[in-house]
């Protein structure tokens, strides 16, 4: 086992108010990542069917693996509907507020949930009913059951109503049931689930810092329908934020596996690299705004890099500032993590690709430049300059396609009532 002990201590060091906002942002990356990926995939294939199928395989491959991880971290036991609900409340596919989910608990074998606001729906509705059907029917049907599979293979998630919306302003946006019937044939693992589960990344152990008495240390209690991240203790919330990063890296690995099947290894990695670059910039913009770092500079770049979701779990992050220079060192907790053939963003970093690191810096301060990157037995080292005299870099073309997404523009309500603090 690889122990995830040092690489994200920046979460544990944040003031609680900042930690809550950063954890929300980290969860939200689960929706930003497909806003970065799918345009690049469409340009590579000119096929919406390919987009739908890669999305299906991406989420089906990764979600059972990361659901199991979150269940262990949060002490979620059992194979009931409430256990499924708790895991969904901690799934980056259901980021809080952006996907404003209401829950009606019935018993251990059934519940209903509905979306008062679905940012993903509002993203695709301008493109017409066919794209809405692709997301809300073609993709949702298999991926929902795959997520529930991690808790109970006989669970089924089925719609009471869902988009395309009739009438066009129908609320809630959709309404679903979760039911467990012993007579159901068990759902089996998706074709890539075992491959994702066997990755070195998936085997990292997420250890918490010393607990303080400022919130829940797990979710072994009854379901709280209006669960919020602010109900968790600081150490638990920091661990959950690390787990959100893990979810997103496992999704990137699963996405690469799905891409390779359709476009081959070389093109798959090229598509993934563009996703990494786009996400680096956009997620940094949001983190910088959340942390009040509008003025940029080397210290601001360093602060965001310590927290950014595109950098791999399982690595210690040593970020140092000297004048207008930032040095980022990523040291793997186990040598098997530094694998150039590892699928996903981890493999990009392990091969010495620097695009995501550079754009993550530029999303904080467009004057930032990646001056050098090196991969050695001890890890990855990047040198970044943030010179006051430098010209502002242009936003990557891959990131421009995210500009109008509701996920990119979404602003969280950080009032105490909405955060649960």
Question: Each PLM stretch: what is its role?
Answer:
Residues 1-112, 119-145, 149-175, 181-421:
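N-terminal accessory segment detector
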């Amino acid at each position: 086992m690889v122990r995830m002990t040092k690489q994200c201590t920046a979460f544990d060091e944040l003031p609680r108010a900042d930690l809550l906002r950063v954890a929300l942002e980290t969860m939200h990356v689960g929706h930003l990542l497909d806003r970065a990926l799918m345009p690049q995939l469409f340009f590579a294939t000119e096929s919406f069917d390919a987009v739908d199928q890669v999305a299906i395989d991406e989420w089906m491959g990764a979600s059972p693996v990361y659901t199991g991880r979150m269940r262990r971290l949060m002490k979620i036991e059992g194979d009931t509907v409430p256990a499924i609900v708790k895991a969904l409340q901690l799934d980056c596919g259901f980021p809080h507020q952006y996907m404003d989910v209401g829950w009606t608990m019935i018993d251990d074998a059934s519940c209903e949930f509905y979306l008062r606001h679905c940012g993903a729906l509002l993203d695709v509705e301008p493109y017409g009913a066919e794209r809405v059907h692709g997301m809300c029917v073609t993709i949702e049907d298999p991926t929902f059951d795959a997520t529930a599979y991690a808790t109970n293979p006989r669970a089924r998630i089925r719609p009471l109503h869902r988009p395309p919306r009739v009438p066009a302003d129908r609320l809630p946006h959709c309404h679903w049931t979760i039911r467990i019937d012993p007579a159901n044939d068990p759902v089996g693992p998706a074709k890539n689930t075992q491959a994702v589960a066997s990755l070195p990344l998936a085997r990292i152990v997420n250890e918490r810092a010393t607990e303080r008495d400022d919130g829940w240390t797990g979710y072994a209690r009854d379901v709280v329908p209006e669960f919020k991240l602010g109900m968790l203790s600081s150490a638990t919330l920091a661990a959950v934020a690390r787990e959100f990063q893990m979810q997103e890296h496992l999704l990137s690995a699963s996405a690469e596996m799905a891409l390779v099947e359709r476009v081959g290894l070389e093109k798959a990695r090229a598509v993934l690299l563009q996703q990494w670059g786009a996400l680096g910039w956009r997620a940094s913009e949001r983190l910088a705004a959340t942390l009040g770092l509008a003025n940029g500079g080397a210290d601001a770049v360093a602060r965001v890099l310590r927290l950014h979701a595109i950098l791999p779990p399982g690595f210690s992050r040593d970020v140092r500032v000297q004048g207008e220079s930032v040095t980022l060192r990523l040291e793997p907790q186990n040598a098997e993590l530094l694998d150039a053939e590892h699928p996903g963003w981890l493999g990009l970093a392990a091969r010495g690709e620097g695009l995501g690191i550079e754009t993550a810096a530029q999303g904080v301060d467009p004057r930032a430049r990646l001056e050098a990157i090196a991969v050695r037995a001890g890890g990855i080292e990047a040198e970044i300059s943030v010179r006051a005299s430098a010209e502002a870099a242009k936003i990557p073309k891959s990131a421009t396609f995210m500009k109008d997404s509701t996920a990119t523009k979404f602003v969280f309500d950080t009032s105490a009532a909405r955060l649960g603090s």
